[in-house]
Amino acid sequence: KSKISKELEVFYNPIMKLNRDTSILLLNLIKDKEMQLALPLAGSGIRGIRFLKELKKNKIKNISFNDYGSIKHIKQNIKLNELEKDSKLKLSSKDANLFLLESKGFDYIDIDPFGSPNQFLDNAIIRISRNGILAVTATDTSALSGSHESACIRKYYAKPLRNELMHEVGIRILIRKVQLIGA
């Protein structure tokens, strides 16, 4: 089990455990591929720590933890989990877009910002490898679920629904935005 410091100044959302669980399941299902993984907005580092501890040993070629403001906390959590000597680890403290632009590319990129992922999509798509996986999380659910219709239209070029289908439609709007940027 992964450990995380209780004295974090960075955002850690325990409710997103299912999201992290799904990432691990997905990556473990990929056959015979040693992957380069990137976490441009690593936050507390918990997702990457779980990757190192829970993915099959031959899955990770290297894993890049990046976060402009919390690399100190990522290092603390890596040490807490006794992973500081892992040669697959790469740490950096750059703006997420700069981190992506300066890289050579990755097989898996996880974009998990606070709010909309839009400002990171262009560079993530540029740096994802052929047949790579781009994981995108959006926490601006008020826009995507229709509470703030004008924000959704402005950010995602789509009109959300405010009914029993709002969450399904919100996911579809986000997927379509990623498709538009990647096209």
Regions flagged by a language model, labelled:
Residues 1-183:
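SAM-dependent transferase fold signal centered on methyltransferase-like domains
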